[in-house]
């Protein structure tokens, strides 16, 4: 694209491409993760019929619907800034200088080319995602139907199928968003993304329940069970994070160590993210008395969500060469986060206002 004859405003926009790309990826990933994670927990509750799922089912459904704008933020960012986010894409989309060595212009679709951004395989991956999304939409309609419409066995089968599809979607998201940027690939990226999304979505659901507990039916919420689930997810996420780091360094894998080397200047942010997301919740949830207190669980969930946001910034900002001390790195993030947060908040509250939030206490 000819940037040489641009105006001052155009030059400024060109300079802001990378900060907005990092911000859009971070905000979009946490929004998409919460949306898919809430769908997973909703399906799990429909499959098992557990008491916690019955009480939180409408909260989870509202969160799944309310955080759909996060999916649009992620898709819009990737669509508008593809060659900024994925440097390898310039070799296939006619943006790079084709006279340079090893540059391949956009041409005939070739399935024999194994490159990540070969248009043929890109279309195949996007087609798979569309099919999976359509499948989840159909199952969502099944789960939202009245009980007298679908047989319980069919509802459980639909929930199980939707859980599998959701995990597949999160795995594809982890590979495409984290491992498809031309950087070093960590072997546990799909599992990492699944744990990240499930922890963030569960924290959001518990936080919403804690804030709305004074409504009718809120007194009967199973707080000890919810605290135990948060503890379990914190431990799972901590294990996955630590095991990946330990395997990478102690096995001395240079290709994978470069992922952490590139983010060395952001190590302070990662430490803060892990402390908020894992350490503080673990220390608080160790005490049974605190696991039974809604206010304590709400504070823990706030820490988890803040830590998840900081971790999302650590995932993408170093790859764009951004400095953590520069104000220009954080301004796009704040703007997108506030905009998406307001839209999601209105969508979430609007979805909850149409019916009773919690079932009647028995």
What label would you give each PLM region?
Residues 103-107, 277-279, 288-362:
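TerminUS-proximal long segments
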Residues 22, 56-71, 153-160, 224-230, ...:
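Alpha-helical transmembrane segments and their helix-start/interface "positive-inside/aromatic belt" motifs
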Residues 21-26, 56-58, 182-194, 258-261, ...:
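Non-cytosolic membrane-interface motifs at loop->transmembrane helix junctions
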Residues 65-84, 232-240, 300-307:
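Hydrophobic alpha-helical membrane-insertion segments
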Residues 3-5, 10-14, 114-276, 287-290, ...:
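Long, contiguous internal "core" modules enriched in hydrophobic/ aromatic residues
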Residues 33-146:
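Transmembrane-helix bundle segments that line or gate the permeation/cavity pathway
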Residues 33-42, 72-76, 126-138, 195-210, ...:
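Hydrophobic cores of alpha-helical transmembrane segments in multi-pass inner/ER membrane proteins
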Residues 1-15, 87-115, 145, 149-153, ...:
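Extramembrane terminal tails and long inter-domain/linker segments of multi-pass membrane proteins
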